[in-house]
Amino acid sequence: MIREIDKNYMKLALSLAKKRKGYTHPNPTVGAVVVKEGKIVGLGYHEKAGKPHAEVMALGQAGEKAKGATLYVTLEPCTHFGRTPPCTDAIIRSGIKRVVVATLDPNPLMSGKGVEKLRNAGIEVDVGVCEEEARELNEDFFTYITQERPYITLKWAQTLDGKLATLTGSSKWITSKESRKVAHILRREATAVLVGVNTVIKDDPHLTVRFVPTEKQPVRIILDPELEVPLSAKVLNTEEAPTIVITKKENEKAEKLKEKGVQVLILKGFNLKNILKKLKELEIMHLMVEGGPRTLTSFLKEGFFDRIVVFIAPKIMGEGLSIGDLGIRSIEESLKVRKKKVENLGEDLVIFFKRY
């Protein structure tokens, strides 16, 4: 039976999981709490892929006190050998009496298997405590598993009249330092950041996390069908972060890019569906698309997005570049999104949207 106290302990487990948001890819972000006789005896979170899972960390901290205790975990414990052994085996060995799970594994081949194994071992299992919060925490992982592609965030900065750049392509800087700091937090949570080659040519960005502390850098991906990227571009400095150039050309320039440590992916079928399929194979779980207007338009037009984050500055540009033609000819055909959150960032606004 689920009680109010179960929700409190699960919220603690969720807060532990959030500490590692962005660092566990391609694994989910998971937290765990072990409670015995009303006292917390073990806390854990999954640090990164290849490291012990949250349940194992919490059980290790609890030690002998795990016998007869309750384990709270934000995602169904795994039953398979991956980078680490199954968590269900560790739970059964520990002597845990009850397990409370926030949400089931999204993989249809695995969903419910962990719960079933624990119940077959005589352990009481309850599922669905803080489920909505747990699913939202790992929405990137759920999409990655169920859609067979990365979770996609489209992010852009615009003026009050909806312009993303001037007619010459200039976009530095539309928004404030406060907005750029939040943008770097979003980068930190992503597995990879993607731009079109025009953005590299016009802005020469680093595409790294710089304004906030970080333990890792996202993979930088450039869509460059004709291999136009300048060899002097900052994004090609692979000492800062890994870089992938996706193209349909195979020539001498591709070899020069490889010499610089850049991974060059040559796709004959150069389209978003094939690109996203390849990125899934490369374990890119959360892809943040940062532009420019042409690249953002292509993702919107083909419906490849899960979240949109728009930074709005109190500036009016008049003529300029904005989201392009989506093939929409009536208001009824407009892409509809759901507002999730609005924040004030100095003079700017940032609005988070989810697709319906």
From Swiss-Prot:
GO molecular function term, any single one: NADP binding
Residues where substrate binds: S171, R187, L207, R210, E290
Cofactor(s) demanded: Zn(2+)
Sequence positions that bind Zn(2+): H53, C78, C87
Keywords: Hydrolase, Metal-binding, Multifunctional enzyme, NADP, Oxidoreductase, Riboflavin biosynthesis, Zinc
Domain of life per record: Bacteria
Details of cofactor binding: Binds 1 zinc ion.
Catalytic activity, reaction form: 2,5-diamino-6-hydroxy-4-(5-phosphoribosylamino)-pyrimidine + H2O + H(+) = 5-amino-6-(5-phospho-D-ribosylamino)uracil + NH4(+); 5-amino-6-(5-phospho-D-ribitylamino)uracil + NADP(+) = 5-amino-6-(5-phospho-D-ribosylamino)uracil + NADPH + H(+)
InterPro entries documented for this protein: APOBEC/CMP_deaminase_Zn-bd, CMP_dCMP_dom, Cytidine_deaminase-like, DHFR-like_dom_sf, Eubact_RibD, RibD_C, RibDG_C, Riboflavin_Biosynth_HTPR
Residues that, per the record, bind NADP(+): A157, W173, T199, D203, G292, P293, R294, T295, L296, T297, S298
Example GO BP: riboflavin biosynthetic process
Record region (Reductase): 149-356
Residue ranges of the region described as Deaminase: 1-148
Biochemical pathway: Cofactor biosynthesis; riboflavin biosynthesis; 5-amino-6-(D-ribitylamino)uracil from GTP: step 2/4; Cofactor biosynthesis; riboflavin biosynthesis; 5-amino-6-(D-ribitylamino)uracil from GTP: step 3/4
Domain annotation CMP/dCMP-type deaminase: ranges: 4-126
UniProt xrefs under Pfam families: dCMP_cyt_deam_1 (PF00383), RibD_C (PF01872)
Entry EC number(s): 3.5.4.26, 1.1.1.193
Active-site residues, Swiss-Prot/TrEMBL: E55 (proton donor)
Functional summary from the UniProt entry: Converts 2,5-diamino-6-(ribosylamino)-4(3h)-pyrimidinone 5'-phosphate into 5-amino-6-(ribosylamino)-2,4(1h,3h)-pyrimidinedione 5'-phosphate.
PANTHER family named in the record: 2,5-DIAMINO-6-RIBOSYLAMINO-4(3H)-PYRIMIDINONE 5'-PHOSPHATE REDUCTASE, DIHYDROFOLATE REDUCTASE FAMILY PROTEIN (AFU_ORTHOLOGUE AFUA_8G06820)
NCBIfam families assigned to the protein according to its UniProt record, in alphabetical order: eubact_ribD, ribD_Cterm
Family (UniProt): In the N-terminal section; belongs to the cytidine and deoxycytidylate deaminase family. In the C-terminal section; belongs to the HTP reductase family.
Protein name in the entry: Riboflavin biosynthesis protein RibD
Annotated organism of origin: Aquifex aeolicus (strain VF5)
